[in-house]
């Protein structure tokens, strides 16, 4: 396994230089740090796949051993570091998704595809962007599209009804 290179710098090597001779600092190159982050992320993905396969295998065994009755015990591997890292990745992806939506909506408005006032476009974009403040406490169901699909279908039904009148 490749070892991370740790460099020691004296105060005069820092930018801006520190006027002291009483300490040194250990440094890691940003490229080494990014490489370690990538390796860590890959391990988390592998751990997630292993956890999923453990659950699937357990379900298979439970089905195959139905004759043992209620004596089957689920015992899954605990992976708190993987779980925390995956939660952090999901939270970041949710935020990036909100940024993407705000950017796309404003680009569509700017190109004339959305016929509304500048104030309304800005208000909607701000609402989308500030939604990131509430994502950490939102239930998982808030991240699927079923509510939006339902509202869109209701609007479409109202529009069809209006056309028929």
UniProtKB/Swiss-Prot annotation:
Name of the protein in question: Eae protein
Lineage: Viruses, Duplodnaviria, Heunggongvirae, Uroviricota, Caudoviricetes
Organism the protein comes from: Salmonella phage P22
Top-level taxon: Viruses
Gene designation: eae
